[in-house]
């Protein structure tokens, strides 16, 4: 991570940290860096989610891109993976998405995709950061024919929808409940599943600029659970604000998280001989029950740090085609280059239709261990050094010895906040509480702050 770019682009409170001025510079400097690696005038797709600040930042970003001669195709409201797909399929130079994903409406973010559809690599981000930190803007200022052009490109959304439909199966007779989080999926999910022939019940489909992710979507699936129970839907599908995540709900209203979704898709691909190297890429946060289920099926795991960026890096480096996170980021590399909630939803319903099994039956093969996570506020300077504190190291070793292999402890720093995260999994809630609370008490006593 750099000074401006985190693991998922540049983020901050809109108009306070992520200002129009910064958005203009990101467009201008980002566009210039991209143009230095292109033989022709770059063509860049720009999309956004439904946040009230989206149009403000979009206008500033596009102005910056145009100022260095970039040709811009404005997609409007579209899922983040829709931008990634269109960049690659239409051979654009790059894509930019304006979104803060599952964060509340006051936040926003800007992330770049390279011409290959993957998030911009660290070297390109560092080139942009160097220009942001320069004392003077010395970039060329073309005039007249040297300026970029702007094209409204709403057909991009429809092309993305049609592509996702092409990867699925006819769903006639299946009742599907959707929660589009008042976000980017509100412009596409209904159409995708209508085209597949599903009977639909939809919530979280009325964005007003302020209600994105507000008590709806993958981080607040309670409303969808209730809708599924009341409507008798066969499955509920909850997306986050930019639709790069999916959390599902079975026909009984029970949650099916990213671990279970990855297992279902992974087992399906494995049985067809289509799971690359018979391996799923996951993170250190995946549940122990998920690991045990994969072991039972003979499916291998590759484990990375938390963050879909690291999952994708491992998949690309090692040639894997399925990976993801417990939070609902699922990357199916045969179809797209990044986590895609709507694509994952189409594949999940496809598996249900093809196997004739209910979602509860498919998900029941993974027994999730009770898990507890506690965040402890610490000084930023200490969060990466916690494991060097003797008392903390000692208590973790003591708790792991008590587990005797039937559980898991993970203590890690937050990548974005001054927090130390203490997580444990064990066969019972009582055991989990004991392990986490015991470790957390020691951490607070040693390095915690109010």
Swiss-Prot record:
Protein name, UniProt field: Phosphoglucosamine mutase
Enzyme superclass (EC): isomerase
EC number of this enzyme: 5.4.2.10
Family to which the UniProt record says this protein belongs: Belongs to the phosphohexose mutase family.
Provenance organism: Streptococcus gordonii (strain Challis / ATCC 35105 / BCRC 15272 / CH1 / DL1 / V288)
Modified residues (Phosphoserine): 101
Annotated GO MF terms: magnesium ion binding; phosphoglucosamine mutase activity; phosphomannomutase activity
BP GO terms, sorted: carbohydrate metabolic process; peptidoglycan biosynthetic process; UDP-N-acetylglucosamine biosynthetic process
One GO cellular component, as annotated: cytosol
Role, per record: Catalyzes the conversion of glucosamine-6-phosphate to glucosamine-1-phosphate.
Catalytic reaction equation(s): alpha-D-glucosamine 1-phosphate = D-glucosamine 6-phosphate
Keywords in alphabetical order: Isomerase, Magnesium, Metal-binding, Phosphoprotein
Modification comment: Activated by phosphorylation.
UniProt keyword NAD, yes or no: no
Residues at which Mg(2+) binds: 101, 240, 242, 244
Entry's cofactor comment: Binds 1 Mg(2+) ion per subunit.
PROSITE patterns hit by this protein: PGM_PMM
Cofactors that this protein relies on: Mg(2+)
Active site annotation, chain numbering: 101
Disulfide topology: none
Gene name as annotated: glmM
InterPro entries associated with the record: A-D-PHexomutase_a/b/a-I (IPR005844), A-D-PHexomutase_a/b/a-I/II/III (IPR016055), A-D-PHexomutase_a/b/a-II (IPR005845), A-D-PHexomutase_a/b/a-III (IPR005846), A-D-PHexomutase_C (IPR005843), A-D-PHexomutase_C_sf (IPR036900), A-D-PHexomutase_CS (IPR016066), Alpha-D-phosphohexomutase_SF (IPR005841)
